[in-house]
């Protein structure tokens, strides 16, 4: 115990002077009790900063046993030193060692609970039934009746009544029972064995785990000892006080967040009151919050303790008499009683010199919340001298230490650079903004540890300062320390001599300056310098910089003191930062003003002549306090930044003047006053320090006077003498106190009697406490002047005064509740009547405004108007409770939770506002970022949440977690949900097509390349992390690592590569322009009819173009696959959670037809194959089915090495679903977009399939067959990468099926050429791994392409294949200077693949064509054997002649050429080009080429000999190699002795009428279904684990003819588009006609494309609206029929558009129709109120809004919400003018403003939130034809005056003005920053919004467009134009 007591003493006295909690003995008693009763080592205990409870560091096992009601000794933290444990107990420290956690122990002393406690309301349970208005009114009436009766009885009846007092329980029993009911567990006896009364008296208690309210901070355990009651809580990391103090931006601009906090607090208080428990004197510290602002209430049980009279007396004596211990253990001294005073008293005491500088600064640190020993938030004091000279030179306290250290130039540079970055970043970028600032921190944790390095363990220093231990790099002297640091000083350098003494053997002690003989002397001298006159006079400037008004605003910028923490508006929670205490200039210390000195200054009657002054110095040792620093200042040149850059003070001038006066020789006075100079110079100086005496060292010499000038007798005041100085200083102090501290006079207390404590009065006190707490939250910056432990009545009076004086600062939503709780208004405002610990502050009136005194239940009632809680709060609260209650440990529970939340989400979103979404969104994002819930949350919740957010916010907040879910390295069960076509359709609709293609599609496609590729591909595709070989890496890709967000409670998690924001940084829409404020017509973001669940699944219909998995197209694909021999396909997808059941088929006949034409031909593929001479395969399996080719069982066996952690079945389902989705998406996007985005990404992915040595291993079977001898030469010999690349190749070839052969020749082949092209540098170098993989991918893809090329096409591009593909590949393969990263293995694989490719081409084109076109590649390949043979056999010497450093030696070969040779690569080449390789290539090529081999290959004899040698080594008894060719011709077993596969397997070899069988060429018989050659080919699978996919052995296959095949204009346009850079921001119009859409019988009045760009709408004079598909057909001359016709209009339709959120169509013919584009059903019709006043213009609000704005002919603007009946708003636009009819309306992209254009050319801008007209101006001289609004508050208008004008919303002059020469621009659309215009003269123009006015105009030819142009719409992603004409035909042009 002695050791424990000593340790505890260290903890208790760790605070500096004035630093310990208010009730030291009480807290010390609590510490002792916890140590004794809970068996926790004293080292592991510490007091909480407020002194209200004890924080304990305990092991998680001990805590788990405590939860199970077993209490044993808590293990000690053996591996941690005392300093480390002390650091771990600090609030700002969040990372704890594994196996350890922190808890809070709250204690109640039983002896203080001995008073009786009167019963209030009986214990009652909350009702489960919803509250009704009738019930609410009944309860109010009954309570009013009871209260009025009781009030009357106490007033009139009780004085005359002699009835006995009602019985009351002892407070101890009442509290014990209430705690058990509230926390749902019983007390566990601890300490000495005692009879636990709770089990006897309390009756049944709830079972463990059922607390009364989830909004209460849960209790880990309730413990009872003979003397104490304990409540053990989990540690609270952040409180509401931290939010309002350090992260106020988290609550800024959102009243809903504050109200939701209040809502949860009231829920908790209501639960406590129902159980008979008061909450105590709550403060902001008692409300625990997390990053999601989910609050939990921590009760203040100490309020129940009633101190006895003796303790009261002791407490007062202690408070008034004793001080607080100093940090030094042995030194205990008293301090003045102002430690507990409010800030006003502290300021006055310091100003008047009654307390020291040190004590005052420590109190300011305490008020700012700084905590002793906290490395992140330790107290700070100023450095005052620089230690360079004896007693140092004083620093300039007008500048921060950071500024003095860094210099003004660097700070200006930092501020300017961050300011420019902030301006450049703007609101549109996703990256965290760069905020202009000068200073990052006042005292960083690194500086703190460097300061205390001598006393801090080495492990801690290595963890925080520098990982490598370098003791000599730490500053060795105080002078070096002070010079090095940019941060301020710490109190230890003023108080603790031990800080200089090192505990490390290899680190010397910190040296004190040479002018001090010991550490103790330095500390005393340093402290004296802090208290010196020079420091005191300027200390107020330092306070202004560190705690005062110079921290923010213009003053901060002027003083270069803008602190990052105060201006970055961070929303992550933190428990430390920079706190501003004062917003007014701090008064200066009054150090004996000469104006009010005890003696008046001598005023001479003679004019003073110029005086020469001489100063001297004397020894000043021992007189530092009396102004020694001042003498040092005079003796030392003031040249550095440490000197003051201001003129001498009035004190200096006064001294000089008085010394001169003393030396003046007056008649009879000369020399009479030798000491007057010193006595007058310092009257009252340093009144707080040692007794002042005469200032030493001052000697003055008098100057002579001219006697003739002394007779006038003028009165001369001393220079600097100001008689009103005292008045000015008094006024400054008064202003500071009034404005900065808001102090007021105190009224004397009146004695009052102490009535008995009643529970009801405690409940009333709780409500008053709640009012105080709310007011403190509102006035957080103004109540910092209160002491942290101020009593409740002090807090109440402070906030009550603030509420009355600053009522306008109170948010409107909180004004009624504050008025009710604190009784601010009324006939007489309450004053504090009782100041007892258990007394209410004042008595509530029995009935106020018809309601009883406030209670939590009353405030929570929806029928009470006291707090305007939004209607969605209960549903939101229920949603959050469900989220918190469910513990998810596996995917099954994750799915159940996501489904349960989805069921409740509809009720939440029905009435939610943008502010409510800010509260909800972090919970959804958290679910989407956690491993077990990510997939199911995305599946269930993405659609409704993204619908409510709108596209802009959905991209901002949901994109990152979606990327994380797609990139997760773990095999998540059900992951295939994310790859279903219906889910991807939702992504396209809710994120926007362009955003989906740019940001998400690359991540979606990565699954096709396997799990490992999704990480490797990050390098080449989306820039994520490096590849990892492990199947389950510790952390996922950089964009989102599961669990990362929840492991660390502190700093925000790192952003992804896209710079997307993390939800931990807070969700706030206020800085955007896409979500409105909470006005009525935009307050809710409604969801359309909630889809009904199908088999417990969320069904969400995407949009019209979604092709369902159960559509005929998909079924046709499946049929094709099944017929082709993959029976497992359907069953595998159907197993488990099949997407077949999740989406209803909504595709119409045309959709099915357009896909069906492809499917039909795929289904007929068997017949085509059978009758073709040119194809060997009888099915198209891998290309037509999503499943990987072959039967499912074999495929799974092949993939097992890749997916050791998963079942092959899940992987198969995943790939199946993903491939189907890619096929669907490729058809949906159209040829140009599919090629630009899908095909390009797939081509990049193909390379990733071969990266790494693992992917380059041949697949082998159980026998040891060498892979080189397996099968025919042109057959595929798969490596692992071939298996992985199967789905990628399948999807690539499907795009070729859709759009035809040009995809192969114009897109794939150029990319292959790019992959194999040699590097730009001339010097040969080693390949990188990605280039190596690219070569393998290129050869593999080329082999696939060759099979599908027609004969004509193949011969046309054969020269390109030879020169751009084969020769570059052979150049790498046969190079003597280029090495492969994977060595011989990669070169061998490339060699085998290249042989197969060349052989395939040879078989396709025949011998003659080989000689004509392929002789060079074949010869080049064979030549390498000769070169190697010469180097090996003849030992050809390498010629070093002429080789300079860095050059390779060269060798001369038999052909006479000299070639460089890298000697280090010879071994690699010899491993590749072996005898076996020679045999493998020579035999088939000799058969393929016959006699031509002698002409093509000069060294064929050498290669033949090498092949013979290999044959001899394999079978020595074989025949002579010379007879090899006849041998090959006759038999064929020699081809592969092990496998038995013979060369006759070659089958049909040529495509020019000849077929090779063995080495004989013959014309084959037609054998459509003959299994002969196919059967032998299939046997290859037994030789090397090869795939038995028949199509891999095909020489030629026909591409099915698709309805979407490119030809004519479509082909020309597609060829152009794939060559255009994706970064090209300009719109190019080439007038290429792509499609026609006839159908309307009248002129087309309006055209509008849907956001997904696969359908568009048109309205016509024929009173119909038509829906058209946008899929490509034919050659540009095809005509497409409409998909749906809406014919409910009665007049000409002049407007059509789409409401994005609900996906409804809005059309107008004078009345507005809202209808469903899926069914054509009318949902709503809005007719004009007066038929004579029709609607003339319509516009829809952008997502997420569902409002429609309409203008009528009477210049009235009306808003309609399609979800609600009736009108929302009605605004008049005319304003008394007669501007004419409204011709056009446009809504800003944010939805915050709408602009109307009139027929008179007038334009009006209206704020949609307030209805106020922001601006009205005459914009044009003629009729306004069209208006559009763009991001950045830009408006574009066109008029009949031939002009197109670009405006800024609130600027008077236009930014650009375009004038059309001949015709007005009557229609236009936007493409990025360009405007595409159309005129009635059929001219299309393109002009820029950014550049000076210039316009490119194109006249539409009559061949491409007939009629007159009436309307125009642009497809921005596809870059197409839809043009409507007056003849009813719409044309698609590009």
From Swiss-Prot:
Compartment(s) where it occurs, according to its Swiss-Prot or TrEMBL record: Early endosome membrane; Late endosome membrane; Lysosome membrane; Cytoplasmic vesicle, Autophagosome membrane
Topology class, membrane: Peripheral membrane protein
Primary location group: membrane
Biased composition (Basic and acidic residues): 316-334, 1589-1599
SUPFAM superfamilies linked to this entry: BEACH domain, Protein kinase-like (PK-like), WD40 repeat-like
Tissue expression remark: Expressed in brain, Purkinje cells of cerebellum, retinal photoreceptor cells and spinal cord (at protein level). In brain, specifically expressed by neuronal cells (at protein level). Detected in a wide range of tissues including intestine, adipose tissue, liver, pancreas, thymus, spleen, kidney, heart, eye, sciatic nerve, and testis.
Keywords attached to this entry: Cytoplasm, Cytoplasmic vesicle, Endosome, Lysosome, Membrane, Mitochondrion, Repeat, Transit peptide, WD repeat
GO terms classed as biological process: aggrephagy; early endosome to late endosome transport; mitochondrion organization; protein stabilization; ubiquitin-dependent protein catabolic process
InterPro entries: BEACH_dom (IPR000409), BEACH_dom_sf (IPR036372), Kinase-like_dom_sf (IPR011009), WD40/YVTN_repeat-like_dom_sf (IPR015943), WD40_repeat_dom_sf (IPR036322), WD40_rpt (IPR001680), WDR81 (IPR052651)
Top-rank lineage group of the source organism: Eukaryota
Bias kind Polar residues: ranges: 1102-1114
One Pfam family it belongs to: WD40
Result of changing residue 1349 to P: Progressive ataxia associated with Purkinje cell death. Retinal thinning due to photoreceptor cell death
Family: Belongs to the WD repeat WDR81 family.
Protein purpose: Functions as a negative regulator of the PI3 kinase/PI3K activity associated with endosomal membranes via BECN1, a core subunit of the PI3K complex. By modifying the phosphatidylinositol 3-phosphate/PtdInsP3 content of endosomal membranes may regulate endosome fusion, recycling, sorting and early to late endosome transport. It is for instance, required for the delivery of cargos like BST2/tetherin from early to late endosome and thereby participates indirectly to their degradation by the lysosome.
Subunit structure: Interacts with WDR91; involved in early to late endosome cargo transport. Interacts with BECN1; negatively regulates the PI3 kinase/PI3K activity associated with endosomal membranes. Interacts with SQSTM1; the interaction is direct and regulates the interaction of SQSTM1 with ubiquitinated proteins. Interacts with MAP1LC3C; recruits MAP1LC3C to ubiquitinated protein aggregates in the aggrephagy process.
Protein name (database record): WD repeat-containing protein 81
Species assigned in the record: Mus musculus
